[in-house]
Amino acid sequence: MTIAIGKFTKDENDLFDIMDDWLRRDRFVFVGWSGLLLFPCAYFAVGGWFTGTTFVTSWYTHGLASSYLEGCNFLTAAVSTPANSLAHSLLLLWGPEAQGDFTRWCQLGGLWTFVALHGAFGLIGFMLRQFELARSVQLRPYNAIAFSGPIAVFVSVFLIYPLGQSGWFFAPSFGVAAIFRFILFFQGFHNWTLNPFHMMGVAGVLGAALLCAIHGATVENTLFEDGDGANTFRAFNPTQAEETYSMVTANRFWSQIFGVAFSNKRWLHFFMLFVPVTGLWMSALGVVGLALNLRAYDFVSQEIRAAEDPEFETFYTKNILLNEGIRAWMAAQDQPHENLIFPEEVLPRGNAL
């Protein structure tokens, strides 16, 4: 028996090798295998949003004007969610709702599902792009891991939350004022600001902003003067082997300010990664809880005492009254298909009234 030892070589490349060579070639804009998902989905999501905000009304789904064509501006235009009666339908253009009629599909809110789903896969494609490039240049994949935070928030807010509710109708519409309305809705119907997962999200995002500002200022403060350039940007060679700033000086400064300081760059930068990403993950988990209508902090004893004693009121009980007002005033406007009519005597009023 003869055993041949050596590298197997093919006479000609197959289709996979040809595609792999073209997709991963070094060029000005890297394409990669991830680009097959990223570029089409991003193109369709952005294009669908521009189309919807420019031309498509929300009259048939929300009773609203939502396009530039109807007189909206950048802050008030939106791609609105489908009607509540359509529940969780994917609203495919060729589906039973639109039956291939593009105008009818737009009127029913088909552009929202189009933008939401292509947007989600576009974001996932962007994360895969970071994985692919990191692999190609032999980097760790922490950029992609960090980007999972925004993806988790997008998927939880735009997809998982409405899936837990009665339909896509209760997801945010894609517009500035529409997102603000959704935030008010979250507060009024879920008391979102008192939710511990929201608190962790705020701590993560604002904490990351603080860390970013402190880190940037500290590096600028401890730059070595190695060059004779006129300013910071000309004083260094981008290929220099030496450190650009003094970690020792920075450590001494913050040790004197706070009594503690980061002892090495790895721990410092990991902490700057950990704080915002964990905050985003936690807020995404909280939104998943809201999709299931889970409640967080309910201080019932304070509510009972406030109801019995007109002189007792806390910031919590005031906020509960505010939430009741949001629900009573917002539901009738936000869900016109329900024909909700609240008589004056049931609308909430503060104890002072």
From Swiss-Prot:
Q: Which reaction does it catalyse?
A: 2 a plastoquinone + 4 hnu + 2 H2O = 2 a plastoquinol + O2
Q: Which PROSITE patterns match?
A: REACTION_CENTER
Binding-site residues, Fe cation: H215, H269
GO BP terms, alphabetized: photosynthetic electron transport in photosystem II
Q: Phosphothreonine modification sites?
A: T2
Q: Which HAMAP family match?
A: PSII_PsbD_D2
Q: What is the protein name stated in its UniProt record?
A: Photosystem II D2 protein
What's the source species for this entry? Solanum lycopersicum
Gene encoding this chain?
psbD
